[in-house]
Amino acid sequence: MWLKYNRRIYQINWEGESMAEKNKTKAYEIGELDHYLFGQGTHYEIYKKLGAHIVNDGEKQGVYFAVWAPHAEKVSVVGEFNDWDAAKNPMKREEPLGIYTCFVPDVQEGALYKYCIQTYKGDHIYKADPFANYAELRPGNASKVTDISALRWTDSKWMERRLTWDHHKEPMSIYEAHIGSWKRHPGREDDGFYTYREFAKAATEYIKEMGYTHIELMGIAEYPFDGSWGYQVTGYYAPTSRYGTPEDFAYMIDYFHKNKIGVILDWVPAHFPKDAHGLADFDGTPTFEYADPRKGEHPDWGTKVFDYGKSEVQNFLIANALFWIEHYHVDGLRVDAVARSEER
């Protein structure tokens, strides 16, 4: 899927006031315009508001957390910084969409965290952040506070050329690769995976030798089970930590671009797994998936199906596609299981 789009600019006045005047919010906080656009399914930068965002604005230092859990009774953020105690950092519910927010001072980059959600039944479930940009290395499954706003890029020439590139006319030859099985270091005690940086250099040499123009990367978004090859995603906004950090992932993309190699990601918007820390029954109810089990599950795969009828779910997925293209400079997406999506 190649994405060419025009940004839509929204200017909304409430009783004569501009949104900036009406909101009176910090840049990292959820405002009325954010609620409106997310509810309409058109907040294409919602990942800048939901999730965990490091704050250092001269007045506050810490992390601002925000999560969509519309049917939760209560939500708290728990982590290393509060001994995983749900009583210490309760979150405030913001209407009308059921977004929970809180600011926790002095939380450092790299801290592990989850959301403790009290369901309508009174149960407590612990969920990873759907908008987390980094995840704990498996078998751990917590989210990890990180700042990806200052990634270093040196591919400006490639990005400028991309604006006018006509992929219908220029030649294209795509090399598909899965980092975890492409090549491994023999004799190591761990799994022997190449890191993002190691793979970038080794794959570039092979791709240039064979004359490919693009690489298509399989299984990049975070996932719990190695055997799924990345097609059962739990962290849609996080490059998997198996091969390194977000900075390492950005380095890989940048390295390919400097060598005039385009990058396509396999993207999985059709379904997601039932792992307890993931999106399934996120707030104790079908949140991201269809409530009707006849529509909400893939019987062959044992996975959940996104409810494309919900504006917030549409927004989650569209913003995710744009996130990879805008924030990580990815050049295109190969959409997985399209036929299964069309069945819905």
Task: Locate predicted features.
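Short proline/glycine-enriched turn/loop motifs at strand-loop junctions of beta-rich domains
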Residues: W68-V75
